[in-house]
Amino acid sequence: MNYQHELKGIFLSNFNLQNFVNYLENDIDFPLIKTSLAPYGQVMNILLGDNKTIKYDFGFVWLMPQAVIGSFNNLINGHVTQFTSIMTEVDDFCNAVIKYSEAFKYLFIVSWSLPSYFRGIGLRDLKNEVGISNCLMRMNLRLADNFDTRKNIYLLDSQKWIGNAGEEAFSSKLWYLSKTPFNNIVFKQALKELKSAIKTISGDSKKMIILDLDDTLWGGILGDIGWENLKLGGHDFTGEAFVEFQSALKTLKEKGILLAIVSKNEEAIALEAILKHPEMILKKDDFIGSEINWDDKSKNILTLLKRVNIGPQSVVFIDDNPVERDRIRQSIPEVYVPEWPANKLEYTKALHKLNCFDIDGTSTEDLERTKLYLAENERNNLKSELNSVDDWLKSLRTVVTVETLNNQNLQRTVQLMNKTNQMNLITRRLTESELLSWVNQKNHKLWTFGVTDKFSNSGLTGILSIEFDDKIIRIFDFILSCRVMGRKIEEIMLNHVIQYSKKNGVDKIVAIYLPTPKNKPCFDFWISKSGFTFIEKENSFIWNFSKSVPEIANIEVINNS
């Protein structure tokens, strides 16, 4: 879902959602959302109706359970009700939602909840088969189970919003006045969650956290008190809070979020503290890089980002000092700098409240991301030691494996397609089902390219797809991860499609470049290194078959396609 334009969403409910959609309409943060309210009180008719003509980017369904599950309403009102009857109705509702979801690229369903003051049958309310709270929890689990394999249905947790709102979540006054059950604080929480979900699905999650050291990763000023006297762990409540904060950062790192350091300190002393302090949860190898010196932090951040080849829009900067935070906001506005609590005991909570690290599925490459970047540092160090690029490439002992799309690489292929910006010819964003539908057309073909070398297995890092018609091939997707750019993988990919074209009697290969604010590196490669001829008026590149296909030395290619 590309949210650079205004997104259109249709909102379906059995209570008054007007306050919620008003907030969405007037919120200026991306993505901008144009709302449409479905007719009130027509839930099942709409879910089961003919929705083929719907022209919305996404759907959003938020319901009160007792108004859509009749057996559950009977239970609430004290009638003897069979649990199996309730679950049958839940399954029927899920089937209707699944049918409705076919009209959308994405459909968001809000989990069911009851007012926090609702006591059900009191002490026995969590008892199996008789308790209303017990039943509601299992109804929500049934929703999750039924939607688990549906790639375009996302279940949002309303209990988070209600919990954050506390006792003010439900409003009796609004309910009796306008059939609006929730106070606006709940709607504001829901707005944040929905927009965060859209960003996550669109591959716009943050990839990296840059951290200060003093009073950020540990308590105290290292240069003044020495590493032995830092507040970190031990029998100290502040030290314990810093250990918990580091543990939370470590968890994010294990999920694929990169960590780095930018700190005003003496580098040798700082690295000694990281190495020697027995309570350090984060070790040196947990960070993909550091800039520890007395230079301006904005300069150091830009230096670090250039070295690891990550754009500032993918970065979060955490620093306890409000002056430093303001400096980065002013000098590098693309970097997200959250407000940070003065109370060090609140650091872990503040980190968990950031919703910019959510991901829509995790691949092997995500879990190994820090190792891959550390391996890239080793490659760059080796490059600086050798006399030429060819010597460097030869020393890497690179192997490229070519495959067609399959069940094993589908998730990673879609992830790479939806996240890659720089080396991306047309910046096409597709879901798994949409990509499979496209590839399964008889005149379409897609290859993936995996890269390994002596330092690491970078995994699936390249995608090339084509459409062929008689004697003409059009290159659609030409995508390469920034981790392997500039290592002749681009040329290997083009050689593959040229050789394929020759074998199949093709007369013409054309690639149309669709510019975005982020994919100029792709254009630069095609202009200077692809060997294709640029046709400016068409913004396209043409291969001249009178040319010989250049040999790419020092790289082994294994073709499993």
What residues fall within each predicted segment?
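A conserved beta-strand-loop-helix scaffold within acyl/acetyltransferase catalytic domains
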Residues: 276, 401, 405-480
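Glycine-rich phosphate-binding "P-loop"
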Residues: 230-237, 277-296, 303
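Substrate-recognition element of Asp-dependent hydrolases with the DxDx(T/V) motif
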Residues: 244-278, 291, 328, 412, ...
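Conserved Lys-Pro-Asp/Glu-containing loop-to-beta segment of HAD-superfamily phosphomonoesterases
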Residues: 301-322, 328
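Basic, amphipathic juxtamembrane/active-site segments
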Residues: 222-247, 333-340
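Acyl-donor binding region in acyl/amide transferases
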Residues: 451-454, 460-536
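Extracellular glycan-modifying ectodomains
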Residues: 1-210, 217-218, 223-228, 323, ...
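Terminal substrate-recognition subdomain of acyl/acetyltransferases
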Residues: 307, 329, 333-396, 499-561
